[in-house]
């Protein structure tokens, strides 16, 4: 579910999309799976001179994302007292959409 939510947010991430639209795409996947109450933060935030900066992909941000922004893509589900899952990548917003610049593999490894 978290991976599907991340993919939905990434698909929406592009210059001109608002932070709320990007967050909403991911949040819908999580809510539709029954975990909406357990996603308590925004989809992502700007990464630059500081690790957390503008622009943010959150429900409150109605500003359009600028071309050239670098943002995190980090949806998560956290079940109190049990466990949490978060997948975090970094996106570069280009004129054509976005590029996921994180090169870590996404396949599930069972050890």
Regions found by a protein language model. Name each.
Residues 1-111:
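Active-site neighborhoods and metal-handling regions in enzymes and metal-associated proteins
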């Amino acid at each position: 579910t978290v991976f599907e939510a991340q993919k939905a947010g990434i698909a929406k991430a592009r210059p001109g999309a608002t932070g709320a639209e990007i967050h909403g795409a991911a949040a819908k996947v999580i809510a539709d799976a029954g975990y909406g109450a357990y996603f308590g933060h925004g989809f992502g935030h700007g990464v630059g001179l500081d690790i957390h900066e503008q622009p943010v992909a959150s429900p409150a941000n109605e500003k359009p994302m600028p071309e050239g922004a670098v943002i995190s893509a980090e949806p998560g589900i956290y079940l109190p007292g049990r466990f949490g899952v978060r997948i975090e990548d970094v996106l570069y917003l280009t004129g054509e959409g976005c590029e996921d610049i994180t090169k870590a593999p996404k396949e599930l490894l069972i050890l």
